[in-house]
Amino acid sequence: LNTAKDIRGDLPEYLASFEYVNGGLFTNSFNSPRFSTKSRKMLIECGSELDWSDINPDIFGSMIQAVADDEERGSLGMHYTSVPNILKVLNPLFLDDLRDQLKEAGGNGRKLLNLRKRISNIRVFDPACGSGNFLVIAYKQMREIEAEINSRRDETDRHSAIPLTNFRGIELRDFPAEIARLALIIAEYQCDLAYRGQKLALAEFLPLDSENWITSGNALQLDWLSICP
C-alpha cells in the first residue's frame, strides 16, 4: 500500500491488486496483534458487513474519548465538542460573513470568483486539535460554500481550491494526531463525492499527499508560526 504499482516487483495477484495509497499511512511496519477467535470474527464482520462508505469523520472525537479511561481524559483535557457547539464558534468567526458575501454576490461571476479566491486563502488552526473535529467541520462548511459558488458559475466539475494543508493542528499524542489527519482526508473525499461526483472523486483520491499538516507535539513549546506557514 505504500509502494507504487510500477515498482512492486513480483507479488501475488491478491497483493498486487491493492491501490497505491501513500500519504504515510502505511510507511512503517508493525507487528500484527494476536486475535482470539471471537475478536477475529468481529473484525471480519466489521470489514465485510458494515457499509464504510458513509462513515462520518465528525464522530471520531467521540470514538477516541470513548476508548480512553476517565483519568486519561481528565489529565489530557480530552473533551469531545459537538458539531452544534463548534458551529457556535465558526459561524460568527467567519462562516456567517462568507455566507453573507455569497448571498450578496448572487449570480455575479466576478464577485463569485473573488469570494472563491478568498475562501481558498483562509487558514484554520487548532493548537489542541485532538482528533480534528473542529478542523473537519470547518473544512466541510467551507466546501459547501465553495460548491454553491461553483454551481452558480457552472463549474461543478472543478477541482476544489481549498487544500487540506490550510487546516493545521497540534495534538500532544500521536494517535489522535493521525486520526485528525485521516478524518480530514475522509472529509475531502466525501465532499468531492457529494459535489463533483463519484468518477472525479475516485480518480483524484489516490495516491494521498505525503505532506503532514497535523503536528504531534506540545503546543506550549512549539513555534506556531513554523507550523502555520
Role assignments for model-derived ranges:
Residues 1-97, 192-202:
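Non-catalytic, mostly N-terminal accessory regions of nucleic-acid modification and defense proteins
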Residues 65, 69-229:
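SAM-dependent methyltransferase catalytic region
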